[in-house]
UniProtKB/Swiss-Prot annotation:
GO terms for biological process: chemotaxis. Gene3D superfamilies: 3.30.1330.200. One of its GO terms (molecular function) is protein-glutamine glutaminase activity. It catalyses: L-glutaminyl-[protein] + H2O = L-glutamyl-[protein] + NH4(+). Its EC number is 3.5.1.44. This is Probable chemoreceptor glutamine deamidase CheD. InterPro entries: CheD-like_sf, Chemorcpt_Glu_NH3ase_CheD, Cytotoxic_necrot_fac-like_cat. The gene is cheD.
Length: 184
């Protein structure tokens, strides 16, 4: 059994994205029906993760609400964050996780989330190098953005209920924008 050096863990919750270039950082999240897209530029050594609740679309009126819940918004934020840190779009690669159907009697929003992520990445010309989506159980995900390594654990029983609860928590309220403009 190989022991891993302890790295700095950064948790990505629903409605967030993180971009890092530190090889000692591992990004982690817990997914039920939500999806996390993990992207990186293997040459520049920068990578990141997002965590979205609903697919959304640029033409959907629902997306005009709390944008941080929607994949269309968080995918753009993640890509732009990577580019700002020196990644090149033509070198980006992605892995997709989550999208479980955790509650049988509800519509399969997890499947819709995963399908959205696949189509978005295809439309953007970003290569998908790994995917683990669907199923009936949540996942705990760890992603090392600099190397692209990912590890997941299936959540069953109590862990699955915790993942469902995590997915149903509201996203954090957006921070107010600071401005030096005074309106009167």
């Amino acid at each position: 059994m190989m022991l891993e050096a302890a790295g700095r863990r950064v948790h990505v919750i629903q409605g967030e994205f993180k971009v890092v270039n530190d090889p000692d950082v591992v990004l982690s999240t817990i997914l039920g029906s939500c999806v996390a897209a993990c992207m990186r530029d293997p040459v520049s050594g920068v990578g990141g993760m997002n965590h979205f609740l609903l697919p959304g679309s640029s033409t959907s009126p629902a997306s005009a609400g709390d944008a941080t819940r929607y994949g269309v918004h968080l995918m753009e934020l993640l890509i732009n964050g990577l580019l700002k840190q020196g990644a090149r779009r033509d070198r980006l690669e992605a892995k997709i996780f989550g999208g479980a159907k955790t509650i049988a009697r509800f519509s399969n929003v997890g499947e819709q989330n995963a399908a959205f992520a696949r189509q978005f990445l295809l439309d953007e010309g970003i290569r998908v190098v790994g995917e683990s989506t669907g199923g009936e159980h949540g996942r705990k995900l760890e992603y090392w953005p600099v190397t692209g390594r990912a590890r997941q654990y299936a959540l069953t029983g109590v862990e699955a209920q915790r993942a469902i609860h995590q997915d149903q928590r509201p996203a954090p309220a957006p921070k107010p924008v600071e401005s030096s403009i005074e309106f009167f």
